[in-house]
């Protein structure tokens, strides 16, 4: 392989990666969410959502309602949680606070929240409200995360494929 051919392959890869990044950022701006698409990682929302379902989020609503399925993050933890709004209340400044619970869980999420936090702040803790989903499409993400053999096999196949491609 000559250097020119390698440069073309590198630039094509850079184009694909930058296009994917721009599409993600555009979707983030449109939905007003830093993570507009998430994968369900646990069974806490069964039967509504199964492990591996991809959820599409929207964060342009001013308030979440009781019964809405929301995705939130807890300060200091990196994994978003998908649960249903169980209760809501407003303070004197009309800020909305939410209590959530997984459909398949026996108790509410109070034990999951940060210390001394009784409710989620709708403005700061919510990633978005679920507006749609694709069943089981995100299961590949779970396989890559949880199965080291699958991860390295997939990486190896991608590497071999890129080495053997002529375009």
Swiss-Prot record:
The chain crosses the membrane at residues 13-30. One of its GO terms (molecular function) is serine-type endopeptidase activity. It is a single-pass type II membrane protein. It comes from the Eukaryota. One of its GO terms (cellular component) is signal peptidase complex. The active site is at 44 (charge relay system), 83 (charge relay system), 109 (charge relay system). It catalyses: Cleavage of hydrophobic, N-terminal signal or leader sequences from secreted and periplasmic proteins. It is found in: Endoplasmic reticulum membrane. It comes from Debaryomyces hansenii (strain ATCC 36239 / CBS 767 / BCRC 21394 / JCM 1990 / NBRC 0083 / IGC 2968). The C-terminal short (CTS) helix is essential for catalytic activity. It may be accommodated as a transmembrane helix in the thinned membrane environment of the complex, similarly to the signal peptide in the complex substrates. This is Signal peptidase complex catalytic subunit SEC11. GO terms for biological process: protein targeting to ER; signal peptide processing. Catalytic component of the signal peptidase complex (SPC) which catalyzes the cleavage of N-terminal signal sequences from nascent proteins as they are translocated into the lumen of the endoplasmic reticulum. Specifically cleaves N-terminal signal peptides that contain a hydrophobic alpha-helix (h-region) shorter than 18-20 amino acids. Residues 31-167 are lumenal. Pfam families: Peptidase_S24 (PF00717). Keywords: Endoplasmic reticulum, Hydrolase, Membrane, Protease, Signal-anchor, Transmembrane, Transmembrane helix. Its EC number is 3.4.21.89. NCBIfam families: sigpep_I_arch (TIGR02228). Residues 153-164 are annotated as: C-terminal short (CTS) helix. Component of the signal peptidase complex (SPC) composed of a catalytic subunit SEC11 and three accessory subunits SPC1, SPC2 and SPC3. The complex induces a local thinning of the ER membrane which is used to measure the length of the signal peptide (SP) h-region of protein substrates. This ensures the selectivity of the complex towards h-regions shorter than 18-20 amino acids. SPC associates with the translocon complex. Its main location: endoplasmic reticulum.
């Amino acid at each position: 392989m000559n250097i020119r051919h390698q440069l073309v392959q590198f630039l094509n890869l850079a184009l694909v990666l930058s296009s994917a990044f721009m599409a993600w950022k555009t979707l983030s701006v449109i939905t007003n969410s830093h993570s507009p698409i998430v994968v369900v990682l646990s069974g806490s929302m069964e039967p509504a959502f199964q492990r591996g379902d991809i959820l599409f989020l929207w964060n342009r609503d001013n308030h979440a309602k009781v019964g809405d399925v929301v995705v939130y993050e807890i300060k200091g933890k990196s994994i978003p949680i998908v649960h249903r709004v169980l209760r809501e209340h407003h303070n004197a400044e009309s800020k909305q606070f939410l209590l959530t619970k997984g459909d398949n869980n026996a108790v509410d999420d109070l034990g999951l929240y940060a210390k001394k936090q009784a409710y989620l702040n709708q403005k700061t803790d919510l990633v978005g409200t679920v507006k749609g989903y694709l069943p089981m499409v995100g299961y590949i993400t779970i396989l890559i995360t949880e199965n080291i053999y699958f991860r390295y096999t997939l990486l190896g196949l991608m590497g071999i494929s890129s080495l053997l491609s002529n375009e």
